[in-house]
Amino acid sequence: MSAQDLGRDAEELADVAAAARAALVSEIDASGAWADDPVWREAFAAVPRHLFVPYYYVGVVGGYERRWGQSPDPAARERWVRGAYADIPLATRLRDGELLSSSSQPSLMAMMLVALEVEDGNRVLEIGAGTGYNAALLAHRLGDDDLVTTVDLEPDITESARQHLAAAGYHPVVVTGDGARGVPERAPFDRIIATCTLRSIPRAWLAQCRPGARILAPLATGLIALAVRDAEHAEGRFLHTPAYFVPLRGATRSEPERAQLGGLPRRARDDELFRFLLALTRGSLDPQEAYVLWEREGQPQRERYGITVSGEHEWAWLDDPEGAYAWALPG
């Protein structure tokens, strides 16, 4: 292929990407995800997601299919770029069939960024660099790369995120380390957002926050929004939406055992809100106790649950932090 042909192909692919990005923005518009803070629309319209996923995997019968932007087949390259703007999570790293890293569903990212309530001049820490796309959205919104720090455990993930960000014209601070420990050398932060699932809130995060800071993180199968009072106290409720992310990895993190659901009615076992309660109370309630509570309280929505952190203690609760239902979370 001549240089002229290569240039024409790149131009055509850029046009496809621009059209696909505009379609994604329109789709998120229609979902109402950023209705409360439409400034995020500009960020999603400007940041080229395809530059953050030079390859990704899509599920097929028997495993995964790899799509990549350097395929010699023009049709395959077009499928890659169109797929990069689908409103779905994209698997970006696998190891022995296990998902290590992904680019989250854009509409969920939009909803989370709105819920983070970012203000001009805020210093933001992202836990889970992933592809770097979310950090780019934050950097674009804030207009200052130095206000954004993103951390991930795997050096190859942070290096590729740094490269993707540079290719898109963004240069936030990318750190390799255990996200549970935060990034103390970049503190204090006004906002912390995690894109990996937690079992409890790391105390290091509170210590690195300014009073009045906000933390948004996946926990159980929901999203908790915490207001930070000081280095030892934070409290907040879950948002309404479900959220499924790769677990936070680190030397001290371990996966909980799966709950045994034998003997429970099928409708409860299959109910997403009941499974949220199971995940939230694992280690405190057995499934039968959780089922009795769930039925007694009218199958509560996520917004009725919350979390309180006070010194060395951390607990989840239903309706009221000081109410009848409270369950300790792992420290």
Short names for language-model regions:
Residues 58, 178-180, 221, 242:
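Short, solvent-exposed coil/turn elements at secondary-structure transition points
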Residues 5-34, 189-191, 195, 199-202, ...:
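Conserved, well-structured beta-alpha core segment at the onset of a catalytic domain
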Residues 2-20, 222-331:
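SAM/dcSAM-binding transferase cores
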Residues 101-218:
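Conserved nucleotide-cofactor-binding alpha/beta core module
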Residues 24, 85, 138, 174, ...:
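Generic structural hydrophobic/aromatic packing signal, biased to beta-strands
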Residues 55-56, 84, 88, 93, ...:
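Surface-exposed loop/turn and secondary-structure junction residues enriched for glycine/proline
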Residues 2-125, 134, 157, 318, ...:
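Class I SAM-dependent transferase core
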